[in-house]
């Protein structure tokens, strides 16, 4: 698969909730950053998304591959707008936030732009350009989830 096809396959797998296939498409040392306070391993990002998909069965990422750039086309730029309703328990223990009971509240994020780097036929990094009103914290605020404060 070429870089665009790899990224599209990952996006399609995440949207469908096929996280086994998604894991196959990311490298073992893949890093995710930008919409979370600190960089995390892509395995943690996949677990968060699996749990988000379970808690929000109608979750739609509105993924779109925008273009392919970089040396040999290994940088793929995508966009995403998440929308969903939390009708089930949301497990955020992969990032230390525990379980959140169903709120039956909806959320929608503005369009986020992402740079995905492909190396050796797998996703090596996923970097979200931070934007106000997007990311995990923004979703949790819209759901009415109280975030711990750090003193």
PLM feature spans:
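C-terminal and inter-domain tail/linker signature
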Residues: 1-151
